[in-house]
Each structure stands twice: as C-alpha cells, then as structure tokens.
Amino acid sequence: MEALTDLKAYLPTTKKELQLRGWDELDVIIFSGDAYIDHPAFGAAVIGRVLEHAGYKVAIVPQPDWRGDHRDFTKLGKPRLFFAITAGSMDSMVNHYTAAKRLRSDDAYTPEGKAGMRPDYCTITYSNILRELYPDSLIVIGGIEASMRRLTHYDYWSNTLKPSILVDSKADVLVYGMGEKQVVEIADAVDRCAVDRCAVDRVAVDRVAVDRCAVDRPEGLKIAALEEIPQIAYMVDGVELSRSGVEWSRSGVELSSSGVEGSSNVQHYSTPTQSLLNTTQPQTILLRSHEEAVKSKRVHAENFRVIETESNKINAATIVQPVGKQYVVVNPPYPTMTTEELDAIYDLPFMYHPHPKYKDKHIPAYEMIRFSVCMHRGCFGGCSFCTISAHQGKQIASRSEESILRQISVLKDLPEWKGYLSDLGGPSANMYGMHGKDMALCEKCARPSCLFPKICNNLNQDFAPLLNIYKRVDALPYVKKSFVGSGVRYDLMSEAYGRELIVNHVSGRLKVAPEHTASNVLQIMRKPSWEQYERFYRFYEKVNKEAGLKQQLIPYFISSHPGCTNQDMKQLADQCKQMHYRPEQVQDFTPTPMTLATTMFYTGLNPYTMEEVYVAKTKEEKQKQNSFFFFWRAPKAEKADRCAERPRRRR
C-alpha cells in the first residue's frame, strides 16, 4: 500500500520531513517515550493530529536519545508556541520494572520490543533537558505519567512521597486526563499572545485592568494567559494565586500576599467526617501541604480522599496544594466529551500504521491493537488499584455507530487485514453508551463506583446500543468475525448480552477480572463477590454447552494487594483447586501513583475510615503471597502452605 510509505501522510519526525512540507518553523514539537504509531490508540499521535487539525504545524520526536549530546532535542529547533512531552502510553517506571522492581527485558512500545529506549522518570528527564537547552520556552507535560503525578504521590520505585511532577520536571503546564481540548486551548492562548507580542504580566493596582497575555520566561510562566483553561495544573507563588482568586469567579478564593489565608470559600479537610458528597457548586479546596504529607502518612491519606472524591464528581472543585513556597493549582476537568466531539477525533486522518522510518520492524503494542476499535472512554467501575477513572473519568463518552463503522472501513484497506477484528471494546467492554437515567442525580454524586458495593439504581443498564453495534459490524461484508478482547464486567451483564458475547464474540478465551476470592480483600478492591463470579462461571459453561463450544474463561488475580494476607491467598488457591484452575493471568500488586490501593500500601490506612490495613510490603512478603498462585507446582505449594500458617504481621 503506497500511501503507508508516504512521509507527507504522517506527522513529521525529521528536518527532511519538514522540508518535504515546505516548513521552516514548527508551532509545537511533541517528545514521546513511545515509538510513533499513527493510530488513535497512541496519545502522541492523537495530540499531534488534533493540533494539526486546529491549524498548527506539529512534529513528533519519538524516543529521543537522552544520554549523549542531546542532538535529538535540538534537531527540529525551537517551536513557536511550546514543547509537549509525554512518557508514552504507560508510566515509564511501570514500563521498566516488575512488581519486584526487577528491570524488564522488553518494551512493547519500541521497535522489536527493545528495552532501554526511554529513561526512568521519562517526563522529568525530557523536560529538564529541554529546560536547559531552551530556558525561555514553554513546556507542557501530559500523558498517564504526568497525569497521575499531578499532586503529591507515593513513588514505589524510590519508596518516597514525591511532590507534583511539576516541581521536578520544571515544566510550566501539566495537562491531565485525555488532553485534546486542553492542548488546543493552550496553543490558541499562546498563539494570541505571540501575535500580540505580549511579554509581561501587567496587572493594575486596582485589579481592574488586566493584561491576560502573559507567557514570559525565564522567571517562570506568568500563567494568566492559561489559568482559566480546564483540566490543567500549574504552579504559582502566593501573590499570583491571590490575583487568581480575584479573577476566578468560580472559586471565590482570596489570598493575602503571603499565601492562602482568610477565605471563607476555601475548604480545608482534615478529618474523615467532613464529607465532600452531594455538592453541585464548584469551589476551591486547599489540601494540606506536601511537606505536611511527608511528615504524616495520615495527612497524605486525608489528602488522597479529597482528591479521589473530587475526581469522581461532575462538578469538581479547583484543588490547591502548597509545595515549598509555591502552590500547585489543579483546575477542574472539562465536561465529559459528547459523541460528536469524540467522533471528530477518530475521524482525523490517522494512517493506522507505524511511521515508515521503522520499515518492517515489529512493534508489539501495535500488533496487539492494529485491528481493534475503541468504542468509548471512561470507566465507572472504580477499582481501588486502577487509574482509568482518575485519567479518563468516571462518566462514559461513547462514539456513534457511524464513527465506529468508518474506522472499520479504513482498517479493511490495510494490507494485513484478514477480516478479523481483535477487539470491539473500551476500558471495560460492556459499558458502551451507559450513563445515569437522571443526570441531575449524577451531578450530586461522588461515588467512586457505579457498581460497588451494588449497582446504582440510577444507572441505565441498556445493552441495546452495544448489541446493535455488534449486529451492524458483523453484517459488514469484509468482516468475518469481531471479537471482544477487552475485559468485561461480569457484574454488569444481561442474559441477552451475555449470550451474544459468549456465542459470537469470544476468540476461544474470555478475560474477566475477579482479582481475588476473599470477601475482605474484594471489599478493599471495590470488586464484586466471589459468589457473583461463580454465578457467571456457571452461566458461561451453560451457554458454551448449549452452543456446542469449548471456550475458556480466564480469570485475572492479584497477590499482595493491601488487605490481603497469606491466609487470604491460601483461600484463593483452595478455590482455584476446587474449580480445577491453574491460574495463568496473575500478577503481584504494583503500587502506581494516585490510586486508592497505592495510598493504602504507603500509609497502611484506609483513607475513608482511617482504619489500619494490613500490607505485604517487603520483597519476601510479596513473594510468599505470589507463590500461592503456583499451588500445582508441588515444591512451591508446600512452601506456600507453611507461609499461610504463620501469624500475619500488622503495619
């Protein structure tokens, strides 16, 4: 397919490709820890295409060499507007290390799966290099790594509580969540300032005449030009925050020149009894400082409770956290994307292929998703260990049927197309099109999960839109079979949907995630009961038998999750023995930034009750729990049984 090798069809990555387009200067340069794959499953490509569609000249520098003379950081020059940085589709530390902190030998987002093509703490490394090379340039960071480190967070790999990544990265603006709207607004704001030649923040003494076009360096970004943009974070000193309080009608914050003082609308939360539920009016919340959180694990747990509660609201508050002599300001998110907005992103001219520079090199992550279709964003499952709701949001944004069919029409023209779709899914495959029956009730809600501890009565559990998509896709003459490769929630299942899924959309194995069998652990995980899994298992076996199929149900399990003891792991092993399972899809818990489970791992406290939670922290403790998965290997099984008999240790 000749078009796949046309360099002008992709976002440029080299000086030569700029010349092919006749460009002398770029507006935005994106640095990514991943290889450049021009596909909507990869964030750098999406952000680049969105900016391109908005009329900006954009280039991507994938996996630059950070070790040598930094020529990869200078080869395209200085952009007119800003540098954009993402570590890639994964946090670079999760990408590099196992739960046991062993270095991984491969990287799915790199040609030939080669490890070592991005640094540890990738966002910080790239940003510091660019700050040194271009001290007066605007730097915007985003992606999952930056997003989940926007406030004080526990870093498992250094075993420390770190401040907002804005501190160590020296970046100016952090875009959290899915960043399409933010980057365009940032580009538009900086572009206006560049055109107007605004260089200094001019605020009249009476605070009436305000020049909003302030983006100068090197003293630091004068954030006035950008401060109203939703879903970003930035740092200011006390004086700048005071000005922001006067200008922000939504927050009503008023500060003295020395810092945050005397505001009746700033809410300070220090005890678990002060609820953030049932409020529809945005406000500003002042967290306890980073320094206080470092000194007290209880303070960090309290801060997290506030952060997670706000992230689950439709009308969230502005969050402010003191760090040293400055303040991190996190603006509330945009409203959930409409179907039309999401469709517009997927209609951009993606090539659905790696950049031609990689030639025929194998990129594992691309091979996995090249014939998959993401039908929606967001997840209302609220699992304790998961980052999806904090990154993509709890509300579901769904694409239209026509948008999905248009993407499949493009995929069929790829040379490798054989007629099979590997996945019609999303973060949780069976949440497509779901929302509250009465959105006014949703606006008053801050539940972390619409499914736990039981399914919300206000949730519209209508599977008709999803079943209709399956029907239309399977009717396409160039589609032989469409599968659901994403995980499904077995606690969100009608009989009609379950039968359609099992009979027509399983490629021999269906992935589900009970995660554990012990009820006390499942409660902490915010997962349904093991009995509910067993009911689904029986239903799955029944439907397979009726249809003459022999498909497997593959459960995912986690060891050493906060709250899990050796005895709980023995119970899991015993349950698997009874069901003749030999667990395959198993993992040891990895604490990742900004999740409830990670907060419990670090503090030993449940942030919502302040009760102590048992945590297996040491390498030996984690290995012991993991060994229970391998009960069918005799030597390990005997050792695991001995471990279970030992008294548990509290932290």
Predicted ranges, named:
Residues 172, 345, 379, 383, ...:
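Conserved, mostly hydrophobic/aromatic
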